[in-house]
Amino acid sequence: MILVVGLGNPGSRYADTRHNIGFRVADELASRAKVESWRSRFSGDFALTAMGSERLALLKPGTFMNVSGRSVRPAASFYKLDLDRVVVVHDELDLPFGQIRLKLGGGDAGHNGLRSITSELGSSDYVRLRFGIGHPPEDFGGSGADYVLQAFAPAELAELGARVGAAADAVELVVRRGLTAAMNTTNQRKRDN
């Protein structure tokens, strides 16, 4: 089994923000797997399905981003998953909009959701799918925290569906072919563009 965690904040106020890109990718995966409904479990929205021969658990924490680990740890523990079977999809300021990178382990780069998950799991050795949202424009008057809680720009929205699809493709590669093959394909593809 692989647990895919899409990070975001609960509630309609945050639904269209950059910080909720993980929820969008989880929803795309659920759609592809023909998940008919989510259920409330592990302090979030949860679905069990399959992708090929692999069992797949999808989780959208219902906690706020800064305490996402309170949802992730119970799910990973319940299914007795090794951390390399946990894939966390999150927004990444340090990548240009729509760029995707897969990696195993690493620091939190100031991302409070990752910080919480690492703290709760007691390790950072889980898989991350980093979805680029870019840095705020120079004329942006707020902080990075303000930026991630804003909606995507119109030009970004025009490309968002395709980019979310590419992120879901990358997760599918992890599930079907393993992390190394998925990293080789996904991370190389982005270098070529």
Regions found by a protein language model. Give the residues of each.
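Nucleotide and nucleotide-moiety/phosphate-recognizing core
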Residues: 2-105, 114-130, 137-146, 150, ...
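Conserved mid-domain beta->alpha element of the FAD-binding
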Residues: 108
